[in-house]
Regions:
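N-terminal metal-binding scaffold of metallo-dependent hydrolase/deaminase domains
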Residues: 1-44, 55
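Divalent metal-coordination and catalytic microenvironments
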Residues: 10, 25, 30, 54, ...
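Metal-associated gating/positioning segment near the N- to mid-region
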Residues: 55-121, 125-126
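Hydrophobic faces of well-ordered beta-strands that scaffold small-molecule active sites
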Residues: 62-64, 117, 152, 252-254, ...
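Active-site environment of divalent metal-dependent phosphoester hydrolases
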Residues: 69-71, 101, 123-127, 259-263, ...
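His/Asp/Glu-enriched, well-ordered alpha-helical/loop segment
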Residues: 73-74, 80-85, 90-93, 251, ...
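Polyanionic/metal-chelating signatures
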Residues: 110-276
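A general structural motif
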Residues: 233-235, 254-258, 279-282, 308-316
Length: 347
């Protein structure tokens, strides 16, 4: 089997050209090396060939929001690992620890042309934990990672309200208050770390060792030796997880359907000077011009199917078009398992 693959005379659709065009595609070791109307030469002669004449050829799709690998296909409770219902604020959770590459949804994704997904916690929690970006093929999630921590999931609206009434989350006011409280505590925690002279580059183990003052002197750098341990705050996994958000290194990823929830997400992001991505954006067509002015990227969908709750009543395929026309940066998402990854065209 050759290291080269030639996809010959396919009708290519991409994100650059407005119209499809016919060309050859040369692939080397799984990566596209060259595209031209006709490719010739020794390498071409040695390549494995797929005759794509009359066949549409697309780049692999990237799904910016789903729960693939955390919500098993036809597994019921045994595979439901995308919502942690013990606490409404769980930033310390990491999606990569729950992804099951052996789940059937990965094969479905490949069948649908989806080659990379951003997958992570659901929307039960005010703060749900970090998403990860992974390839949709492989046996071990560590080898499939594109990026281990892409964004911090937060949620507004009906889902956190419905899940945590017994823990005092009855209203949208409470959802917003809990988010503000966590971000404020993270800012205070960060301030204390800076006051103690703590290097920002420390990983969690180094941080925990330093706070327990058990780091061996031979392990310390010059920067480590400048740390004032008497000023170090007690190690807090939740606050550690929120530091990249507060420092502008990781965006918030906000589940928001209703227009007022979208505005609340934007309001809080601007209050704390943090980055933001908006998911679902169901009422986006109603406020498209405003969203374009704000400039935060929006992920829309899935738009296919019945409105299963009140905040979905404006869902429809008109939404991404209206947002794009207004000038927003738009992606269309499956929210898998809501829409299976093998059917991205339905989103």
């Amino acid at each position: 089997m050759s290291n080269y693959l030639l996809i010959k005379q396919g009708t290519i659709h991409n994100a650059i050209e407005e119209e499809p065009f016919v060309a050859d595609i040369l692939v080397e070791n799984g990566k596209i090396k060259k595209i031209a109307p006709v490719l010739e030469g020794k390498i071409i002669n040695d390549a494995d060939v797929i005759d794509a004449t009359g066949i549409d050829v697309y780049p692999g799709f990237v799904d910016a929001h789903c729960h693939m690998g955390l919500d098993g296909y036809a597994t019921g409770f045994a595979g439901e690992d995308y919502n942690e219902l013990g606490d409404p604020v769980t930033p310390q959770l990491s999606a990569v620890d729950a992804v099951n590459p052996q789940d059937g949804t990965f094969q479905m994704a490949c069948e649908g042309g989806v080659i990379c997904v951003c997958t992570g916690p659901g929307s039960s929690n005010v703060i749900g934990g970090t998403f990860c970006a992974i390839k949709t093929y492989g046996k071990r999630v560590d080898d499939m990672l594109v990026k281990e921590k892409t964004a911090m999931k937060i949620a507004f609206g009906e889902n956190p309200k419905n899940c945590y009434k017994e823990k005092g989350v009855y209203s949208r006011m409470s959802v917003a208050a809990k988010l503000r409280e966590a971000l404020t505590k993270a800012k205070i925690y960060d301030t204390k770390l800076h006051a103690a002279g703590c290097p920002e580059g420390w990983n969690e183990l180094e941080m925990e060792q330093a706070q327990e003052q058990v780091m061996d002197d031979s392990q310390k750098t010059d920067a480590d030796r400048k740390v004032d341990f008497s000023k170090m705050p007690a190690y807090d996994a939740k606050m550690e997880a929120l530091l990249p958000v507060i420092r502008g290194e990781m965006p918030l990823k906000a589940h928001a359907h209703r227009a007022d929830d979208i505005y609340t997400a934007i309001r809080i992001a601007k209050e704390f000077h943090v980055d933001l991505r908006i998911d679902h954006t169901t009422d986006g067509a109603l406020i498209a011009d405003d969203l374009a002015k704000e400039g935060f990227p929006v992920a829309v969908g899935p738009s296919f199917g019945h409105a299963t709750k009140y905040e979905l009543r404006h869902k429809g395929f008109h939404t991404p078009a209206a947002l794009a026309k207004a000038g927003c940066q738009v992606s269309i998402i499956t929210d898998s398992p809501v829409i299976e990854e093998r059917y991205p065209a339905l989103c």
